[in-house]
Amino acid sequence: TYVHCSPVMRDQHNKMSKRHGDPSYEDLKAQGYLTEAILNYVALLGWSPRGDQAEREVFSLQELAEVFDIAGISKSPAIFDIEKLTHFNALYLRAMSPEDFAKIAEPYIREAVKNPAVDAAAVAALLQARCEKLTDIPEKVDFFDALPDYGTDLFTNKKSKTNPEVSKAMLEAAIPALEGLGDWSQ
């Protein structure tokens, strides 16, 4: 059986094209998108599930094969929305087991954190709910190796009547309260 699918558009008037810099599968993978998220999103471009699956968006490849029905193919062109793909990717990242996420996140963590004493699995546990793409990871953890140099002007505010000496006293007073909070790992 031959089926014609509507084109995937970059915007309302232009088809996606590698000539115009639109991303390929390999480009999306390099940008930190998971294969499962890409497949799920692309499957829903120009097709929508029917019946009791009509409101559902997230499918495994096996589930897509089971629920696919040719009647769900749209005649209208579909517009590729990178924000929607990013949303799908974030859903897939958050749905992963902590162990699986740590395994795929470690190369991105090690890209920014060279200190071998830093536990990549512990860092991954903190990042899983905060990342939309794997390539977000290095910029979120680069401070582990080198803290930025903050000047004393950060502690000066005329409106709040603070200066470095007052700020130091306030921070010293806050230490006992913060120490009483216990676990800081989350």
Region locations from a protein language model:
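Alpha-helical recognition segments enriched in aromatics with Gly/Pro capping
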Residues: 1-93, 106-107, 165, 186
